[in-house]
């Protein structure tokens, strides 16, 4: 179990979680405010 918790705290897992959160936030912003570059 210690190895599993050590794996969850590594940098790639944190990067995957953070990047998936940022991409989901960007997709939701584009869903509610489409074509934001035309403003």
Curated annotation (Swiss-Prot):
Record's subcellular location: Cellular thylakoid membrane
GO biological process, one term: photosynthesis
Membrane topology: Single-pass membrane protein
Keyword Cell membrane part of the UniProt annotation: no
CC annotations in GO: photosystem I; plasma membrane-derived thylakoid membrane
Top-rank taxon: Bacteria
Keywords: Membrane, Photosynthesis, Photosystem I, Thylakoid, Transmembrane, Transmembrane helix
Pfam families assigned to the protein according to its UniProt record, in alphabetical order: PSI_PsaJ
Keyword NAD on entry: no
Transmembrane regions listed in the UniProt entry: 7-27
Chief place of localization: membrane
InterPro entries: PSI_PsaJ, PSI_PsaJ_sf
Entry function: May help in the organization of the PsaE and PsaF subunits.
Stated family: Belongs to the PsaJ family.
Official protein name in the record: Photosystem I reaction center subunit IX
Organism: Synechococcus sp. (strain JA-2-3B'a(2-13))
Species classification: Bacteria, Bacillati, Cyanobacteriota, Cyanophyceae, Synechococcales
């Amino acid at each position: 179990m210690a190895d599993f918790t050590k794996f969850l705290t590594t940098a790639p897992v944190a990067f995957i979680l953070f990047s998936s959160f940022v991409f989901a936030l960007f997709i939701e912003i584009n869903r509610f405010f489409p074509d934001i570059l035309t403003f």
